[in-house]
């Protein structure tokens, strides 16, 4: 940090009212010469008044400000320093700009250093997000409650931990020991009274949020470990496993509604829109597969991509589907035309693991490099950095108000990011040029600050002062 001193700081401490009565160009006749101090020391008088620095300062009575006496003053000060053993070294200045310590003349109304002001302002800002959560085990998935300030967290030990959060603290409300192996996915239903979880033990558990009791379970829901899950309606949800099998479930039925196997690799993401007609899934073998829910059969399957398709998001009032990949690429599909993409955007080089839509055009993505980025996806642009982890971002979710994002990585922590500032964000036009600086630009939610943003206020203050 550079040391920025206010121009008024020196004047407020160096003004001597006695010097204003004569012209600095002429030497005052009544100034005491240095040799007089040597012959007639006034130490006794100084000792009597020494206790009150504010009423009396020897330098104010005998100090010299004329440039003609600088050499004599230096000699006098060095002699005094030898006689007094260097105790008055602080008062041996050759000019009248620093007669006292800064703290002696400090005034709260005086203009402070602008850098210090900026730091104090940041410290005094009220918290706009909950504190980080440090967990004992790896976090595999998390999900916000649809109405309450609750966050469900799945861990590698098979537990589902429910946290209640505020801007001041995060407390554990309940711990559900539901699975014998690592949790893969956890979701609240639309009403928020049920908590559904899947795990590597191939089971699906439905837990009552209020009582913590098990409401329903499927022990051997899949032949392979369940990889992902998505709520469809109040009573239905879909699951996909490591072997490429998709199943649609109804909480009121014992057996799955239907089962399909259209891919050979793991199903990474499942999504639908408000109409609930098409169910889309991405897989590790590079396919986007669309299922017609009413007909319970495959609608269309895309051309294969030479990369894993990892995440999806619906934008532009359900008219666009954007798919992220393990190579950091984004493919845009017109809704209903899922055979091949209509647009492509090359994003960061790191693979994309998660995508959370926050507006009709903007999403927050989490990647292998541990960075959460804001992406304007229709058209494709990087807007900046929302937050960061030290390891790859594995899971993310957005709360019901759309103001808070929670994310986690393999460093055993959950971090929150306030993204309310996107409410006033302008849309990007198609003919606008991409900004390369946006790749490393920190947005207000980031834990890191842009140096240009920090000092921009200082530059503005200096230019304003020069204009005055």
UniProtKB/Swiss-Prot annotation:
A Pfam family in this protein? WDR55
Per the record, the similarity remark reads: Belongs to the WD repeat WDR55 family.
Q: Which organism is it from?
A: Aedes aegypti
Protein name stated in the entry: WD repeat-containing protein 55 homolog
Where is the sequence biased in composition, kind Acidic residues?
15-26, 41-58, 67-91
Entry-linked PANTHER family? WD REPEAT-CONTAINING PROTEIN 55 (PTHR44019:SF20)
Keywords (alphabetical) are:
Repeat, WD repeat
Q: Segment Disordered: which positions?
A: 1-107
Chain positions of WD repeats: 134-173, 178-217, 221-259, 262-301, 304-343, 388-427
Listed InterPro entries? WD40/YVTN_repeat-like_dom_sf (IPR015943), WD40_repeat_CS (IPR019775), WD40_repeat_dom_sf (IPR036322), WD40_rpt (IPR001680), WDR55_POC1 (IPR050505)
Q: SMART domains under this entry?
A: WD40
Say yes or no: keyword Repeat present: yes
